[in-house]
């Protein structure tokens, strides 16, 4: 029957399923969606065109948000003199084990016909793991007076952190990101900036990625090295683990003192500036995959999808001209509609491959809406429509489809957010004892999905460390929206003034 054409499917397009082996399912979704692949360089990945279009959409949206909050883009060196990192002891300690170091500036032939390093550098150069130190040294030259402040700059760049256990998009030796670095005359202004930018990240995560997040403060042991305070957005993935999707750091005067960022105040005094930094990376794509995708492949929120609608013409040789004319006019009508204040992005897939193969190609890539049009549809004035999060496809009047395409995309965006929020709420608990804590986070097998988010009162972060390390759990954040009254520490039974979200994490 015509009504079954887009709904018949194998049991799942991705194997293994999430329940069978979540880590391997994640890797298979990336491959099936053609997002990225491993490179010849250990720990690095090749981001393929579909994945890079997705990253470009992330960039565009965030870049507009940064500029709307008064920030400008600039670019700073990839290489950082080792002496710059040594000026901020806590900072360098946090990154020392991950740094890639350049010690020579050329190659020369060796006697065996190969190449060897030559021209040893006077001072080793670090391939940036983050840019606070090199940017701070530049700001020290730019800032002389309070009139030079604030400085509000963002950089789109690549960074290197020599990870030993890598996973595409989540943890790679080289990754793409943005890092904002700002300088202020007062502590109050810098704190306001820190809070403003974590709110930008929350807005983007929830309204563009359709990914609900918890905004909170990191505890002292979890803060960014050298920061006075770190704010983060934390999301729950479908395996109930947490993923830190973005951070915003109030650096106090720590980096300005190390880098000599000083200015003359209105009163004529020489003062150290107050700085912030904040960033997100291609890790967001990993978060998006694990928040929404299913056992048939990638599921994309429409606001970030490279293509909103794909049209698959179905014809035999004698009907090709008629079908293609109809499909092209349908594409033009749909592209003239708007969704989220931008034109609907529509493509036609006229490749000479089997219809079923073509359908699953787009399902696995997460295209939000798939349309099929053949001679019978033209005669009836209808289009066969499949929406990515719906199990069945249906026929719909062409005029109705065109008139409601923006609404359908908006509905899908909201449904993805609602499903992710429900999943988080269904897997969030409050625990009051060590026994409950151990049971909640206990491993139930190599591939079993267990745990979730646990609200717990606690009184001393240091005393929790042996238990947390044993269970591979971390304190994700102290949520800023939490209005809980004083409670009892789940570990010691002593009075505790605050509570936090605990979870296993990426």
Swiss-Prot record:
List the keywords (alphabetical). Answer: Aminoacyl-tRNA synthetase, ATP-binding, Cytoplasm, Ligase, Nucleotide-binding, Protein biosynthesis
| Aminoacyl-tRNA synthetase found in the keyword field | yes
Domain of life of the native organism: Bacteria
The record's catalysed reaction(s) read: tRNA(Pro) + L-proline + ATP = L-prolyl-tRNA(Pro) + AMP + diphosphate
What is any Pfam family matched here?
Answer: tRNA-synt_2b
Q: How does it assemble?
A: Homodimer.
What does the function comment of this entry state?
Answer: Catalyzes the attachment of proline to tRNA(Pro) in a two-step reaction: proline is first activated by ATP to form Pro-AMP and then transferred to the acceptor end of tRNA(Pro).
Q: Does the keyword Aminoacyl-tRNA synthetase apply?
A: yes
This one is known as Proline--tRNA ligase
What information about domains appears in the record's comments? Answer: Consists of three domains: the N-terminal catalytic domain, the anticodon-binding domain and the C-terminal extension.
Q: Name one GO biological process term.
A: prolyl-tRNA aminoacylation
In the Enzyme Commission scheme, what number(s) does this protein have?
6.1.1.15
**Example GO molecular function term?**
proline-tRNA ligase activity
One GO CC term, this protein: aminoacyl-tRNA synthetase multienzyme complex
What subcellular compartments does it reside in?
A: Cytoplasm
Q: Which family does it belong to?
A: Belongs to the class-II aminoacyl-tRNA synthetase family. ProS type 3 subfamily.
Enzyme class, spelled out = ligase
Which cysteine pairs are joined by S-S bonds? none
């Amino acid at each position: 029957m015509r009504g079954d054409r887009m709904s018949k499917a194998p049991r799942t397009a991705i194997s293994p399923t999430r329940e069978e082996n979540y880590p391997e399912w994640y890797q298979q979704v990336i491959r099936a969606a053609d997002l990225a692949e491993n490179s010849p360089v250990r720990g690095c990945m090749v981001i393929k065109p579909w994945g890079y279009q997705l990253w470009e959409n992330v960039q565009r949206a965030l870049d507009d948000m940064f500029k709307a909050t008064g920030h400008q883009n600039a670019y700073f060196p990839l290489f950082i003199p080792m002496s710059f990192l040594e000026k901020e002891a806590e900072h360098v300690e946090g990154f020392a084990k991950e740094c890639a170091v350049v010690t020579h500036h050329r190659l020369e032939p060796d006697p065996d016909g190969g190449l060897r390093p030559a021209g040893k550098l006077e001072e080793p150069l670090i391939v940036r793991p983050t840019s606070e130190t090199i940017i701070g040294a530049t700001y020290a030259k730019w800032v002389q007076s309070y009139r030079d402040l604030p400085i509000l700059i963002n950089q789109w760049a690549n960074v290197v952190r020599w990870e030993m256990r890598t996973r595409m998009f989540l943890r790679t030796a080289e990754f793409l990101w943005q890092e904002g670095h700002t300088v202020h005359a007062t502590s109050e202004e810098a704190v306001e900036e820190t809070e403003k930018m974590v709110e930008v990240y929350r807005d983007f995560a929830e309204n563009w990625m359709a990914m609900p997040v918890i905004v909170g403060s990191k505890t002292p042991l979890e803060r960014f090295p050298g920061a006075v305070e770190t704010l983060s957005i934390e999301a729950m993935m479908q395996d109930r683990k947490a993923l830190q999707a973005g951070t915003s750091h109030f650096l106090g005067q720590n980096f300005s003192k190390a880098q000599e960022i000083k200015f003359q105040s209105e009163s004529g005094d020489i003062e150290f500036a107050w700085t912030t930094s904040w960033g997100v990376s291609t890790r967001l794509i990993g978060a998006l995959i694990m928040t929404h995708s299913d056992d048939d492949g990638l599921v994309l929120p429409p606001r970030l999808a490279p293509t909103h609608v794909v049209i698959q013409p179905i014809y035999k040789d004698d009907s090709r001209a008629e079908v293609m004319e109809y499909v092209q006019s349908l594409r033009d009508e749909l592209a003239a509609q708007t969704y989220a204040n931008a034109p609907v992005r529509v493509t036609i897939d006229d490749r000479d491959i089997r219809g079923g193969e073509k359908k699953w190609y787009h399902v696995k890539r997460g295209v939000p809406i798939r349309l099929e049009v053949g001679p019978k549809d033209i005669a009836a004035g209808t289009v066969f429509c499949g929406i990515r999060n719906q199990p069945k496809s249906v026929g719909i009047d062409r005029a109705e489809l065109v008139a409601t395409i923006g609404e359908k995309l908006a509905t899908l965006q909201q449904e993805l957010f609602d499903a992710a929020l429900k999943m988080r709420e269904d897997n969030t608990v409050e625990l009051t004892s060590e026994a409950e804590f151990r049971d909640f986070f206990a491993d139930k097998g190599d591939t079993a999905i267990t745990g979730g988010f646990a609200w717990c009162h606690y009184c001393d972060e240091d005393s929790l460390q042996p238990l947390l390390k044993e269970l591979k759990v971390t304190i994700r954040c102290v949520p800023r929206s939490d209005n809980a009254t004083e409670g009892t520490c789940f570990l010691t039974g002593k009075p505790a003034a605050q509570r936090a979200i605990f979870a296993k994490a990426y």
